[in-house]
């Protein structure tokens, strides 16, 4: 049977795969901004409470995945 493959992190090396790999892309810029902000607060001597950040990943569909034949696709939001 057919197999769909999904990666994680959207590495720049994915551009060299065949077929192009579908992936889950993390919001690296937002994650880095939050981490650096907390670090700078600590360095400045401000008390930093433990905080849980939730970041929204993005599914990037490329050539390594396909809709199963004969099924209706379901979009998750």
UniProtKB/Swiss-Prot annotation:
A GO MF term: transcription cis-regulatory region binding
Keyword Zinc part of the UniProt annotation: no
Record keywords: DNA-binding, Transcription, Transcription regulation
Pfam families documented for this protein: Peripla_BP_3
Keyword Chloroplast applies: no
Function: Putative sugar-binding regulatory protein for the alpha-amylase gene.
Protein name: Uncharacterized HTH-type transcriptional regulator in aml 5'region
Organism annotation: Streptomyces violaceus
